[in-house]
Structures are given as structure tokens and as C-alpha cells.
């Protein structure tokens, strides 16, 4: 058993070991100095955060946080009670009046401190993330870093949230707009990016002057909570950021609470559709980023080595558990001859625990996820797809109990097959072949999802044609995962998104603020009274 170090006196503690009596030992809470792990044979409990204080839930419903490579019990997480959810929302509501009047510069300085703290603790948080989610350490660091970029962008809110001004729109009349915060915002985040997705949400919401209630994934909340600890350490005031844990009941409570003004969601299509409908019916502003079936179109003139490396990395990285993972490869013309080389690349990838050096593909999040993936692979075989590379029976030495699925490739796939119509969310690539680029564009556009697509080519003309005619919100040219940097917005479309405005960039500032238009005319003593104006005109 490894040694656990404890926090210094006065530091916020969101991981608390269980004592023999079940009471909290406030002097021995896990800190940022160590990853959550078993203490004296009992797992630490994850706390709620309400009004700036760690709160032990009174619920009887606790779930286990399991290392997907080892099945080690890392912690237990509570499903918050209705009263605890209400307290968190009301804490955010009460904090809003003061926080919205906090000068923009003061909010920005908190974000500047926050980004420095996240950068300082990034390697340590990555170890926690890898342990609870299964990602390789390098990918876990990337998860955090892509979120860190959003914090950095939040430091520019002084220019991002500026309004507009036009003088003398009529005689002596000026019109200008203000961007003002909307109130309590809620965020519901998925298991596959426990750092990046929360950081898409609460830093931008808070720096815009809102307060926030976060519900992380119950499957891997530990790294998220470490990021929350750092936000409080950076100076986020009590009540401005709150955290509750749970499942559907918590989601529904946030979507229907009278004091919540906006809901941000990233996750599956089924849950995202439910969130959008329920929250919209209760008058909330909603952004819902959902499932995907991302295609990569390969032209024969593409750089062969670069393309194959990109496809293998985008298809099998993070064990395929990315909403922007490449899941379908469309070979155009003679490029279908590259399939054996793609299989060879996939065979070279090392499947192991994310903590092991040199690992390329870690485990999937849970035994249930593995069982679902394997069932879909069986369906693919039954439907007649060719199992070109079979990762179903992989065993990892030293981690025989891990939730591993090896890189898997199906060829001869058709659009009618369930494996094509369903987001598998595992290390599985489907391969299709078409004669022309026009056929490829038609194929991709006929799929209901619209998160991302890639084109691999050396032809500028082909690339321009593709980006113009493809009906997908995010396009990569010789880039397999076209997730924009935070200066631009995440613009997934069609069946992958509900709501007009996406995460981060300019769109999220619009989402987290409301526009107020002011039309003003000032008079002095010399102003001549023009009499009563009964028309709509400004004169």
C-alpha cells in the first residue's frame, strides 16, 4: 500500500477518508499532494461542494469509482439528495447578486491564478485521471491541457464580452448593447473527458459573471474534484462554484429547478436529447453536445504514412471513447489498397494500463461498457461485415481483470448495419470504399450525425470542394480530430447537437450572457421642447 500524504491545515478537502464509525475525519482528508487511493483498507468518500464548503452527503446511495485496468476501488461517490441539490442551486443563486457586480478585472485575475495552479498540478491530476478513467498518462495530460486552454481564453473576457455602441442613430440618440450574466448555470459532464469538459463549462460561465452548479460523471469524478479544489484555491468565492454528484435524478433536478437559467450538457445522444427537451420545457437556455459517427475520407493522393498514422491514432486513442474519435474510414478509389497497412499499424499499438509506459490503448471505462462493445462486435459479424482485425479476446498480462478491448477493424461495412448506425464508443474502426469523392460526400452527408469529419488529400481543389459541400459542423483537412482551439467555438451540428450555441469561443460568451440594448437621449437646459411625438420614429 502506498503512502498517502494529507492536506495542510485550512485547505479545502473534497476527498475524505471513512473512519471506522463512518464519520468524517477532518484532519485526514486527501489533498492535491496525492491521488485518491485506498486508506487503511477503506476508500475515501467524494464530497459535495456547497457554498464553498465540502459537504458529506446524507444519501444512502453511494457508487464505486473503479480503476478500469485493475478493478481497484478508488473511492465512493454519493448520489446527492433532493435537499442537497436545492441547497447547491440556492447557494449559487445567493452568490450571484454579488458576483455579477464583481469587476471584470477581478474575475480575470482569478482565472489567471487558476490557470497557473492547473499548470502546476497538471502531472498529478493526470495520474488521478488515468487511474479512474483508464487513459494513458500522455492522453490524460492532453485532456487537462485542452481544458487549460479554455481557462487561458477566459482570461480574455475583457475583450470577449464587450458590447457594441453606435452614436447618433437619431438626433442626439445613442444606442449600445451590454452583455450581462444570466444567473445560475448548470453543467452536466461525461466520463470520457473528466477534465476538459468541465473546464469547457464553469470557467467561462464564471468569468462572464454567472454562478455554477457542476454535476461531474459519477464514474470518474476524482480528477474533476481536484480541478474544483484548485478553482477555490485560486479565489472563486463561496457559492460561485458548487458541485453535486448523481445520476438521472440529479440531472432532472437541475433541468427543472426554477433558479437555474442555463444548462450545458456533453454526453450520449439519448441523455442529451432528454436534457434538452426537459430543460427547454422549463424555460432554460440549453446547449447539448451529443453522440457522433465521425468519418475520415481518404483520397489516393494523400500522404500515405501520415494518413495511416492519423487514422490509427484517431480511431484507437483513448480506446475510442471520444465524441470526436474517427470511427468510419471511407477509402476513395485506389486508396482501399491501404487497408492491410492500416491493420499492420493497429497491430503495433500497445494495449495496457494507462499508467504503464509506452501504452497506446488503455481500457474502456467499465465492464458494462466492454460488454456493450463486444455485443456490437458480435452484431457486426452476424450482419456480414468482415472482421479484419479482432480485438475481442485480448488479455493484458498483469491486468487480466481490466476492461480491455483491443483495436478492432471491420471492412465491407454497409450503411444498413447496426455497427454503422450506432456509436460504438470503443476502439473500433469501420472501413468502407467508394469510387469517387462525390460518393464519399454523399455517404457522409447521409449519416444523421454531424460532429466532425476529416479529409486526407494533397489536392487543394479537392479540399475546397469537400469543405464547401460537406454538411458537418467541424472539418479537418489532413487532421483527423478537428476540435478547434478555444479562440473558435466547438461547432458540431445536426444529430450531434441540440441548441444554437456551442462550447467555448465566441459562441459560449453569447450562451452565458444576455444582451441588453440601451437607447439613450440626454437633455440639457438649452434643449428645445419639440412637443409630443405620437409616432414610433426617433427624431
Describe these PLM feature segments.
Residues 270-414, 437-438, 477, 526-528, ...:
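ALDH superfamily catalytic-core signature
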Residues 8, 13-15, 25-69, 392:
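Hydrophobic face of amphipathic alpha-helices that form TPR/SEL1-like repeat modules
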Residues 163-308, 434:
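Rossmann-like NAD(P) dinucleotide-binding subdomain of oxidoreductase/dehydrogenase enzymes
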Residues 72-161, 172:
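Glycine-rich loop-to-alpha-helix module at the N-terminal edge of alpha/beta enzyme cores
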Residues 25-27, 31, 72-76, 260, ...:
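Conserved C-terminal structural/oligomerization subdomain of aldehyde/semialdehyde dehydrogenase
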Amino acid at each position: 500500500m502506498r503512502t498517502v500524504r494529507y492536506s495542510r491545515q485550512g485547505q479545502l478537502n473534497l476527498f475524505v477518508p471513512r473512519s471506522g464509525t463512518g464519520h468524517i475525519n477532518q484532519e485526514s482528508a486527501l489533498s492535491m499532494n496525492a491521488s485518491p487511493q485506498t486508506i487503511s483498507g477503506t476508500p475515501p468518500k467524494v464530497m459535495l461542494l456547497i457554498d464553498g464548503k465540502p459537504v458529506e452527503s446524507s444519501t444512502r446511495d453511494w457508487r464505486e469509482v473503479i480503476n478500469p485496468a485493475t478493478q481497484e476501488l478508488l473511492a465512493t461517490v454519493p448520489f446527492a439528495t433532493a435537499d442537497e441539490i436545492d441547497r447547491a442551486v440556492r447557494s449559487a443563486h445567493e452568490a450571484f447578486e454579488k458576483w455579477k457586480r464583481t469587476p471584470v478585472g477581478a474575475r480575470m485575475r482569478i482565472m489567471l491564478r487558476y490557470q497557473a495552479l492547473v499548470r502546476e498540478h497538471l502531472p498529478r491530476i493526470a495520474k488521478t485521471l488515468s487511474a479512474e478513467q483508464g487513459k494513458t498518462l500522455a492522453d490524460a495530460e492532453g485532456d487537462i491541457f485542452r481544458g487549460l486552454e479554455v481557462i487561458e481564453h477566459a482570461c480574455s473576457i475583457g475583450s470577449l464580452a464587450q458590447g457594441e455602441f453606435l452614436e447618433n442613430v437619431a438626433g442626439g440618440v445613442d444606442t449600445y448593447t451590454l452583455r450581462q450574466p444570466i444567473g445560475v448555470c448548470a453543467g452536466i459532464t461525461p466520463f470520457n473527458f473528466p477534465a476538459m469538459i468541465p473546464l469547457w463549462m464553469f470557467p467561462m460561465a464564471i468569468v462572464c459573471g454567472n454562478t455554477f452548479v457542476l454535476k461531474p460523471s459519477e464514474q470518474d469524478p476524482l480528477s474533476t474534484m481536484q480541478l474544483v479544489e484548485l478553482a477555490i484555491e485560486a479565489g472563486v468565492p463561496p457559492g460561485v462554484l458548487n458541485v453535486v454528484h448523481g445520476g438521472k435524478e440529479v440531472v432532472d433536478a437541475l433541468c427543472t429547478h426554477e433558479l437555474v437559467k442555463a444548462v450545458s450538457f456533453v454526453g450520449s445522444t439519448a441523455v442529451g436529447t432528454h436534457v434538452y427537451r426537459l430543460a427547454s420545457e422549463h424555460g432554460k437556455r440549453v446547449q447539448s453536445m451529443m453522440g457522433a459517427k465521425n468519418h475520415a475520407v481518404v483520397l489516393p493522393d494523400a500522404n500515405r504514412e501520415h494518413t495511416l498514422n492519423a487514422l490509427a491514432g484517431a480511431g484507437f486513442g483513448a480506446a475510442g471513447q471520444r465524441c470526436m474519435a474517427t470511427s468510419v474510414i471511407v477509402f476513395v478509389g485506389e486508396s482501399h489498397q491501404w487497408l492491410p497497412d492500416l491493420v499492420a499499424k493497429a497491430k503495433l499499438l500497445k494495449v495496457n494500463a494507462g499508467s504503464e509506459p509506452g501504452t497506446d490503448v488503455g481500457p474502456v471505462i467499465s465492464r458494462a461498457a466492454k460488454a456493450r462493445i463486444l455485443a456490437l462486435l458480435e452484431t457486426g459479424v452476424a450482419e456480414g461485415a468482415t472482421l479484419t482485425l479482432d480485438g475481442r479476446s485480448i488479455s493484458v498480462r498483469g491486468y487480466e481483470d481490466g476492461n480491455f478491448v483491443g483495436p478492432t477493424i471491420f471492412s465491407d461495412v454497409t450503411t444498413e448495419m447496426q455497427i454503422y448506425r450506432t456509436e460504438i464508443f470503443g476502439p473500433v474502426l469501420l472501413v468502407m470504399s467508394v469510387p469517387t469523392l462525390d460518393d464519399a460526400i454523399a455517404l457522409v452527408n447521409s449519416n444523421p450525425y454531424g460532429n466532425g469529419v476529416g479529409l486526407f488529400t494533397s489536392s487543394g481543389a479537392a479540399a475546397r470542394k469537400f469543405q464547401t459541400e460537406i454538411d458537418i459542423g467541424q472539418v479537418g483537412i489532413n487532421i483527423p480530430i478537428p476540435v478547434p482551439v478555444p479562440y473558435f467555438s466547438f461547432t458540431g451540428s445536426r444529430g450531434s447537437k441540440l441548441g444554437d450555441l456551442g462550447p467555448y469561443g465566441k459562441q459560449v460568451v453569447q450562451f452565458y450572457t444576455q444582451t441588453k440594448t440601451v437607447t439613450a437621449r440626454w437633455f440639457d437646459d438649452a434643449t428645445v421642447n419639440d412637443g409630443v411625438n405620437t409616432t414610433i420614429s426617433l427624431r
